[in-house]
Amino acid sequence: MTTNLKQKLKTAPKKPGCYLWKDSNGKVLYVGKASNIFNRVHQYFQKNNPYKTQLLSSQISDVDFFILKDENDALNLEAKLINQYQPRFNLVLKQNNGYLYFYITKAKKPTLELARKYQIKTTKCFGPFASSKFKLREIHDLLLKLFPLRKCAPHQKNHPCFYFQMGLCMGQCMQTDTKEKYQQVISNIEQFFNDPSVVINYLKAAEKKASDNQEFEKAQQFLTLQKAVLELTKTHHTTIIKQKSSHDFIGYVFQNNVLAITIFCYEKGELTDKEQAVFTLEQTDIVEVESAIITFIYHHYKTTPLPSKITVSLDETNLKLISDSLKIGVFKPKNGNEKLILQTVIDNAKHALATKWLKFTSNYDKTQLHKDLAQLLNTDYIHSLEIIDVSFYDQNHVVGCMLRFEDGKKIKHLSRRYNINSLKKGDTNHIALLVYRRILSAMQTKANLPFSDLLIIDGGKAQIKSVKQVFSLFSNVKPPIIIGLVKNKNHQTDHIMLSDFQVKKIAINSPLFHYLATIQTEVDGFAKRSAFNKLSNHQLQNPLLQIPGVGKITAQILFDNFQTLNNIKLASVNELSQFIKKPLAQKIKTYFAKQTD
């Protein structure tokens, strides 16, 4: 296994998506899908694998990942990539691949149909869905029953058709249908894919009626159908862009002077390719970052065919600048669907950034880095260090986290998380209480958790001062060396602050800077995940997860962008809909408005 492949496997995303195994020449050997890419790709290198898998793994030199929203998107993309690359280790896919779309025909008197191919000329199209996963035929029949459109032949007049007599047809056969009725039914069907509550309530009532009549088999069918509807609408992110032309989505992430940019390329509404670039910037000012993004986009499309449209999140001035330069439409995401796609692109950029950071640090001599750090801090040697951070989504769910490193290697079994419960609020008080808990752990012989040589705090003067005050309470405890990692106004690692509040600058392209920035990012992510998990485990105290349609992923997106539950409550519908679909944003606002009444 090559060094490059080992590094990529270490940072493989623990999310749904597709992976492409490649040989030393960059040729795709195999395309696969997974609900957890990290777990799946590591299975290929187990010793007890069958011969074909061992033969494949012996030829693998590289891997590429597509992070997607769910397994359904992964199933769909896998089929496209296999047809595109024709990898030798993939079985040939049948043309009938099991993916279905709901679509409403583009006619004066439309019908609701199921098809195995995206119908670009339709009025509305929803999907694709894996037919093996959802009861699509049953759901189709259910929608026709609840929201009847035209079922009879266009020429049938003045005689009720079979479906009309059963209440399953709009009634063009009896001339009772109108344009307004069709529009209302189409609106109801479209609403179903965003909010299935009307259909779910119908199924619950039908289930109860069947159960009361002791028709338990029928009741079970209604229950199964409820689950299928919920799963279908939860999965329906609609990665379809309804247009015949090409459309590129550009997402980016900037952290610790490193900019990662990812482009998803869509052709005729379907994802066909991905481009990525990661590079270091000397300046961290947001104006310089956006300037670098504009320059990248301009040069990228000098050597790449232009799409018909580009979606990227930049200010209006920069959008116009790119549009005028490339002579095409460049826009911010306009609706919930485009925002969801762009968020997926950003997730891929985040992964590219994490992979780049690992590549930066894995090539360094970690022992030498600790020697360099000791020299900077005027001490003999730093064998071990601990870095701490706190995170919270509201003041009732605060978590403090600590990661321990010895000679540059993370010691997982010595890492800790602490629940922080304090009447005093604020980051400084939370840090102080975290250190207090850490000192108590060190004093307990059973804990076997002695102090490290160095304690790194995510913060500056106020945090360092509070930590020193905590240590002063314990006369029998010798404090470690204490420093703070201070971020700039753009929340990027900037400099070190010593315990005497002296500032130490580090060259941003130096191995030591990359190392410290990496572990700071790692403890920040550890703390945020821990705080969110704590909140999720207290659903009775977390009204957000009680709202129909809001799951853990949606809640995580909102908390990542608004930080606290109170901020989410105060946000407007437009502010919320920057990250989630507008109907769901309106539902959240309505839910919290009722609570305050």
Curated annotation (Swiss-Prot):
Q: Which SMART domains match?
A: GIYc
The record's GO CC annotations read:
cytoplasm; excinuclease repair complex
- Where the record annotates domain GIY-YIG, the positions are 14-91
Q: Name one Pfam family in it.
A: UvrC_RNaseH
Quaternary structure and interacting proteins, as annotated? Interacts with UvrB in an incision complex.
Protein purpose: The UvrABC repair system catalyzes the recognition and processing of DNA lesions. UvrC both incises the 5' and 3' sides of the lesion. The N-terminal half is responsible for the 3' incision and the C-terminal half is responsible for the 5' incision.
Name of protein: UvrABC system protein C
This chain's source organism reads Mycoplasma genitalium (strain ATCC 33530 / DSM 19775 / NCTC 10195 / G37)
